[in-house]
């Protein structure tokens, strides 16, 4: 009952679709994940699910997360990735180009190294980084 949820999408049509669901204690905002339109220390938690591969500048995303999370707050990041070089090559050179021909706007598949380096530069601590089912990243990051 005391919880408040904020949904963010860069596409106004998706925000309108979300608003029509009339979800209690929720607001929906048009905005960019690489430059969150929120105050500092605004959130206890940020969940980013299946959209990270659309962000051209991952460092800007993690910098926004750091700015908007309260101290001790957590980011839950879920997206596609792999530690398998062949699978990464396939996703980068076959899957993403086909998806983009269909209008998906994918930019890149996240790499473990990129996530770890971006978090470190932003001053965030990676508490957990798992790859499940061969290509599903589950990452928990804390603002220290």
Regions found by a protein language model. Name each.
Residues 1-35:
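Class I SAM-dependent methyltransferase SAM/SAH-binding core
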Residues 50-51:
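Short catalytic micro-motifs in class I SAM-dependent methyltransferases
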Residues 59-71:
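A short glycine-rich, Lys/Arg-flanked "PGG" loop and its adjoining helix->strand segment in the class I
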Residues 47:
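A conserved beta-strand element that flanks and buttresses the S-adenosyl-L-methionine
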Residues 139-144:
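C-terminal lobe and adjacent flexible extensions of AdoMet/dcAdoMet transferase-like proteins
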Residues 43-44:
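Local beta-strand N-terminus motif with an aromatic residue
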Residues 76-122, 127-138:
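C-terminal alpha-helical "lid/dimerization" subdomain adjacent to the S-adenosyl-L-methionine
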């Amino acid at each position: 009952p005391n919880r408040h949820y904020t949904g963010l999408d860069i596409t106004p049509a998706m925000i309108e679709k979300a608003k029509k669901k009339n979800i209690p204690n929720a607001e929906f905002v048009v905005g960019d994940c690489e430059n969150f339109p929120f105050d500092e220390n605004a959130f206890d938690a940020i969940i980013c699910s299946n959209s990270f591969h659309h962000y051209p500048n991952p460092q800007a995303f993690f910098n926004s997360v750091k700015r908007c999370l309260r101290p001790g707050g957590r980011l839950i990041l879920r997206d596609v990735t792999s530690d398998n070089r062949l699978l990464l090559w396939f996703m980068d050179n076959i899957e993403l180009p086909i998806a983009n021909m269909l209008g998906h706007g994918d930019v890149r598949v996240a790499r473990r190294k990129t996530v770890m380096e971006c978090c470190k530069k932003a001053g965030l601590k990676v508490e957990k980084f798992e790859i499940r089912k061969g290509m599903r990243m589950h990452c928990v990051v804390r603002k220290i």
